[in-house]
């Protein structure tokens, strides 16, 4: 569901449901759900897991001078330098409410800061960021948040008037404005809006204090409250009036970011690059959490081979790579032999004998799947859906596409989290069992042409794939081959990303292949609840409607006791496994290469945090 590590965007910045990304796009983007959440990694299971009731936690105002996160930074490190990375595609919008793509998440994560974040080494702990402190009452339904004073929005030049607008202080009213915009039914924020449907009210007590009252008890109410960001009223309604239609479609403002975070967007050349510079009045400087790197450049390069060559030539300092590149191209003398995994630091892998790059590897907090639109026949039949999964050779996909850099899964939770039921094994590749199910569903080759038919209709359908995505292309090619052997004709339509997303938003497709990033604490509501099935642009785009699932989801949301919630999640996992609305594919390893010139690098449970990086200096 990368916006990276500032509250689940550090794991996921705007809690938008599912930044959907595939293969190399995932490895390059900061984790965020599409229309929704920046994202649990492999080592969380190895950690002494503390599933805590974060909704009932309280923080007292911080009296120390530094943030608890300051221990991960090097405040005395030499400031300066340029950090160059690459992303696979540009975005249509940088609007923090309506933007829904991985690229937007990545840029926004650097330019703004939510009220709270997670501790980098102990992500079960919530820490203040733009907030100074908070208190909860009434079983987590009432949350009072105190903002830091002196936080400043970046200056900007108004795209309409051409007038320069200086820095302006952030207030609680800007956070209220963010929520008001999300909840405006005319704003294109359907997926994000669903997360706040149970928020009864939010008000600014004064310029620096907020009060939120949730209508229902919700185990993520504190987390969701701390995910909020201030939205600059003076930028989005310079005349004092809010126009939701203009907010959606104002391409000039939606190509800008006015945040209050560590970096300021200074240049965007469409389909070429983004340039960001350190914001010298960033409030994090006084807390010891200001980045040392002066400038960030994100090159937009569609071809993965071109990106890799740029890394080798020194044009890039860090790069997410495909499993194919990892296995075939990172074993040369330029690359350190030891791989950095969760808990390791760059200092643990000293470079020697001409080595220029370090390798970083950990499970991504995301999964890929093949989804079946249950509004379309024959995918309204769970016998057919189960047969489809039995005809998907996931072991072959893991081996040939991912080079065994990942894990096959059976359900919708992160596979190393306590919510995932490890007793439920993925269905095997079993064409014989699939044939029996299809026969039971009355599919047979009645005219001997090699294609199954039922009620005079052939078993022919179209699966969508994204142009220029080699991982997805390989997966669907393998699937097509196995389906053909079973008498099923799968056509493949290759679409550009905006067209692809448009098809999903309108539910105008039969089968798709996508991926979800996952928040730290999972809530299946947005992707799986029946109420989300008909939302245009919503995350339940496959139209999964199941009353038993709805009851479980609603119970999960209201259960604060961790062990009880885990049991409910495992029941939900079992139900999804029985229904097979998706063919769950793989949780991939997140594979990254970083230049030897980058220091203060650590692989945290939720991945790398490039804000901590130092160019030169000590490790």
Model-derived regions: residue spans:
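Detector for C-terminal structural segments
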Residues: 23, 27, 36, 67, ...
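Ligand/substrate-recognition segments at binding pockets and active sites
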Residues: 48-51, 85, 270-271, 289, ...
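N-terminal lobe/hinge region of extracytoplasmic solute-binding protein
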Residues: 68-71, 81-138, 180, 258-260, ...
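Gly/Pro-rich hinge or "lid" segments in bacterial periplasmic/extracellular proteins
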Residues: 113, 119-121, 207, 226-291, ...
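Aromatic- and charge-enriched surface segment that lines or borders ligand/interaction sites
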Residues: 132-187, 307-310, 378
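Alpha-helical secondary-structure segments
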Residues: 171-176, 207, 211-213, 261-262, ...
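Surface-exposed binding/hinge segments that line
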Residues: 187-241, 264-267
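Ligand-site clamp/hinge motif
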Residues: 249-254, 281-344, 480, 489-491, ...
């Amino acid at each position: 569901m990368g916006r990276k590590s500032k509250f689940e965007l550090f794991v996921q910045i705007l809690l938008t449901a599912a930044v959907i990304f595939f293969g190399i796009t995932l490895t390059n983007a900061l984790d965020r759900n599409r229309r929704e959440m920046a994202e649990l990694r492999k080592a969380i299971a190895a950690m002494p897991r503390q599933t805590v009731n974060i909704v009932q936690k309280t923080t007292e105002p911080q009296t120390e001078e530094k943030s608890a996160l300051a221990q991960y930074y090097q405040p005395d490190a030499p400031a300066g330098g340029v950090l160059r990375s690459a992303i696979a595609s540009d975005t249509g919008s940088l609007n923090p409410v309506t933007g829904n793509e991985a690229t937007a998440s990545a840029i926004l994560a650097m330019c703004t800061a939510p009220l709270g974040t997670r501790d980098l080494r102990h992500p079960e702990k919530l820490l203040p960021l733009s907030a100074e402190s908070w208190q909860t009452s009434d079983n987590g339904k009432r949350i009072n948040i105190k903002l830091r004073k002196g936080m400043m929005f970046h200056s900007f030049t108004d795209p309409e008037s051409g007038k320069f607008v200086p820095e302006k202080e952030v207030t609680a009213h800007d956070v209220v404005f963010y929520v008001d915009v999300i909840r405006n039914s005319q704003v294109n924020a359907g997926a994000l809006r669903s997360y706040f449907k149970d928020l009864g009210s939010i008000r600014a007590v004064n310029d620096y204090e907020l009060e939120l009252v949730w209508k229902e008890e919700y185990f993520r109410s504190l987390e969701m409250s701390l995910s909020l960001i201030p939205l600059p009223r003076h930028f989005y309604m310079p005349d004092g009036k809010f126009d939701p239609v203009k907010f959606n479609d104002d391409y000039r403002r939606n190509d800008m970011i006015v945040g209050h975070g560590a970096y300021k967007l200074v240049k965007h050349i469409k389909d070429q690059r983004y340039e960001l510079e350190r914001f010298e009045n960033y409030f994090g400087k006084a807390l010891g959490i200001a980045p040392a790197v002066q400038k960030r450049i994100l090159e937009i390069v569609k071809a993965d081979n071109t990106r890799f060559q740029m890394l080798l030539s020194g044009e890039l300092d860090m790069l997410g790579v495909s499993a194919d590149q990892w296995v075939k191209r990172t074993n040369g003398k330029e690359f350190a032999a030891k791989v950095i995994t969760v808990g390791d630091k760059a200092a643990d892998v000293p470079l020697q004998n001409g080595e220029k790059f370090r390798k970083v590897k950990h499970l991504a907090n995301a999964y890929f799947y093949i989804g079946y639109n249950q509004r379309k026949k024959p995918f309204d039949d769970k016998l057919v859906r189960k047969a489809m999964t039995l005809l998907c050779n996931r072991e072959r996909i893991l081996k040939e596409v991912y080079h065994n850099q990942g894990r096959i899964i059976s359900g919708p939770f992160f596979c190393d989290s306590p919510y995932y039921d490890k007793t439920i094994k993925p269905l095997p590749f079993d064409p014989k069992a699939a044939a029996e199910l299809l026969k039971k569903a009355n599919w047979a080759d009645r005219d001997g042409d090699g294609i199954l038919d039922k009620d005079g209709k052939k078993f022919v359908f179209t699966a969508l794939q994204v142009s220029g995505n080699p991982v997805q292309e390989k997966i669907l090619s393998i699937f097509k081959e196995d389906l053909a052997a079973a008498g099923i004709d799968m056509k493949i339509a290759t679409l550009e990303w905006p067209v692809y997303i448009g098809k999903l938003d309108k539910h105008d497709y039969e089968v798709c292949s996508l991926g979800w990033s996952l928040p730290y604490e999972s809530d299946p509501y947005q992707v799986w609840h029946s109420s989300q099935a008909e939302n245009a642009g919503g995350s339940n785009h496959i139209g999964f409607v199941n009353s038993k699932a709805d009851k479980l989801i609603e119970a999960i949301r209201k259960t604060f006791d961790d062990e009880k919630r885990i049991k409910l999640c495992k029941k939900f996992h079992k139900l999804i496994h029985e229904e097979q609305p998706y063919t769950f594919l793989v949780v991939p390893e997140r594979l990254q290469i970083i230049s030897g010139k980058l220091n203060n690098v650590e692989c945290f449970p939720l991945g790398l945090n490039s804000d901590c990086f130092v160019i030169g200096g000590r490790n």
